[in-house]
Design a protein with these regions (language model features):
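A conserved beta-strand-loop-helix scaffold within acyl/acetyltransferase catalytic domains
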Residues: 1-102, 149, 181-190
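Generic signal for short, ordered secondary-structure residues
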Residues: 12, 34-37, 96, 112-113, ...
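Extended aliphatic helical segments
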Residues: 15, 29, 66-69, 118, ...
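Mixed-charge, polar/low-complexity N-terminal
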Residues: 29-30, 51-53, 114, 120-121, ...
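Hydrophobic alpha-helix feature that most strongly marks membrane-spanning transmembrane helices
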Residues: 38, 42-45, 59-63, 76, ...
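Acyl-donor binding region in acyl/amide transferases
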Residues: 87-153, 160
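Acidic/histidine-enriched, glycine/proline-rich intrinsically disordered or flexible terminal extensions
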Residues: 159, 163-190
Length: 190
């Protein structure tokens, strides 16, 4: 019920969602998406690191491996989500909007992406790191890994010590968060 309501509310007031790939990824579409990307980057965790040319190159060189889920209202693009198409998965990367609309983020980044992936025979959707709100929408917590090399031996030991504790806490958090998934728990199953 909640998901149906969210989806209805996201697409109210004449908002429509479109899944674009291949030749549908025009420069005008990339212009709009870049505006969304810049707006989100300027409001959240620091500065955006991709320039406008990057998106043109993405469209030129791998348009068939890109899915943009875009929303428009009254003929004007208002939000979008960038996904990369893998062999068996759809990978959500960036989101942005120039209109703040309830649940539109969930509609474009999760629900539309899941529908598109199912319709194209992909086994899963990887929605990216962070966000406890993903649990209610059926995304299992998964550990995200990274690798770093630290030149200074003293600093490396300090970071290694911290990361040992961090790994244990992340494992506990992942186990605890799994309990909140909206799936039925049956005896003998996860």
């Amino acid at each position: 019920k909640t998901i149906r309501r969210e989806r209805r509310d996201a697409l109210a007031d004449g908002v429509e969602a479109l899944c674009l790939t291949g030749s549908d990824l025009t420069e005008a579409v990339w212009d709009a998406f870049f505006d969304f990307y810049m707006d989100t980057g300027s409001r959240k965790w620091g500065r955006p690191y991709l320039n406008r040319r990057f998106f043109s190159l993405l469209g030129e060189r791998m348009a068939d491996r890109v899915l943009l889920v875009m929303a428009r209202r009254g003929g004007r693009w208002i939000a979008g989500a960038l996904n990369l198409i893998g062999a068996d998965a759809l990978y959500g990367r960036n989101w942005g909007a120039i209109e703040n609309r309830p649940f539109l983020h969930f509609e474009l980044c999760y629900y539309q992406a899941i529908e598109w992936a199912i319709g194209h025979g992909l086994a899963r959707v990887e929605a990216g790191a962070q966000g406890e709100h993903k649990l209610a929408r059926g995304y299992r917590p998964t550990t995200t890994y990274s690798a770093h090399w630290i030149a200074d031996p003293s600093f490396r030991r300090a970071v290694d010590d911290y990361l040992g504790r961090e790994r244990r806490q992340v494992a506990r958090d992942e186990a605890a968060l799994t309990e909140y998934l909206p799936f039925r728990h049956e005896e003998g199953s996860e």
